[in-house]
Amino acid sequence: MKYLIYLSLACSSIVVSAQEKSLQWQQVAAGVWKAVAGVPKKISPLSIANIQPNIEALSKLGKPAFPVNLQQSVNEIFDAKTLLRFPLEKEEQLFGLGLNFKSVQQRGTIKELQVDHYGGKDDGRTHAPVALYISDKGYGVLINAARRIKVYAGIAVRKDSKNPPEEMNRNTQSNWDPQPYSDAVEIVVPAPGTEIYVFAGSNALEVVQRYNLFCGGGVLPPKWGLGFTQRTPTLFSDKQVMEEVAAFESKGYPLSFIGLEPGWQTYSYPNNFVWDSTRFPQPQNFVRRLLDKNIRINLWINPYVSSRSPIYKNVLPYTGTHTVWAGVVPDLTLQPVQNLYKKLFLQQHLDIGVSGYKVDETDGYDVWLWPDGAKFPSGLGGEQMRQIYGLQFQKMSDQWFREKNQRTYGLTRASNAGSPSLPYVIYNDYYNHRDFI
């Protein structure tokens, strides 16, 4: 009898833990609702971006009702994962799910959303894998988790579906479909909790507007950020850069900012973040001469720290278990790390007139960056850190320029949800011109 009681308790525990629950939505702004499944981690893309919703502008867009077709959305915590399901209508179209190069319509696709170098496939591995899908029915769903989120966008079919596909005989029915009709978006978050946001609007454009405004609104770039730029070879000296500028002037070509590649530093890959005194003996004078011509300077960096960097010794206790190109990987979420970067970057760059950064290699490849099993002092694992690393550097550096009341406009290889208000654009090392067009 004792064993039967134990078995009964175990079975009831399984049933309760695996039971689907309706998502409970709370309105957080005009046309924006939030639900919580399980117990979310404190670190998420939106928390890293520290979004400040533009409540007034959101209200001006109107106050739409909660999307009726999402009222049947459910969640479940199972196998230490959060399972989410959102209904779809028969002809509903879906868009979004991060930066894609070859596809627009996403219904019928599977995406595993991970910050990574884009390798030629729209499979979710991309520079900005924002877990936001937009419906032509006038709503969008955002999953706010710093995880490798898997999305089955109208492709999975449950046996208890209220709108099941017709069973067909491939032997005799020529219209047999290898991908039967699916009436839901199913999402797997590899963590026992997440936040979910819904954005409503009269059309897809308004939904995107509402998402952008909820993240603080878009960026007003400096005029020079929209101008013509030129990046010089990695080992160019100050003299060679000035000769390049003179060549532009002699031909009457406009030039708004010059990008210096890794060789502006004494040591790169990993980096010391300090000007090379042989190629740039007087960096402040060099930057000033360019500013006098109304030309800005943008510096290439990646965040990985060489043992030859002035901050190496002090940052070492705040670094992860793994290295990148033998350089240590600081936990950028920690305040002491942010303070060390800020002090050095202000001294070496911003205080002498540098106007922005090109932030490289915060995306991938897997063979370059830390593994999922990496651990960081904040308690974040490798998977989580990879999802927010580029976003965190954007936020840090944006704050430096804001404190100087100076606009910046930079380039980044990695971003995520919450970034619309940050003054960076995506770039990459993917060179298939046809895919860009």
Predicted regions and their residues:
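Bacterial Sec-dependent N-terminal signal peptides
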Residues: 1-22
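Catalytic-domain carbohydrate-binding cleft regions of carbohydrate-active enzymes
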Residues: 20-437
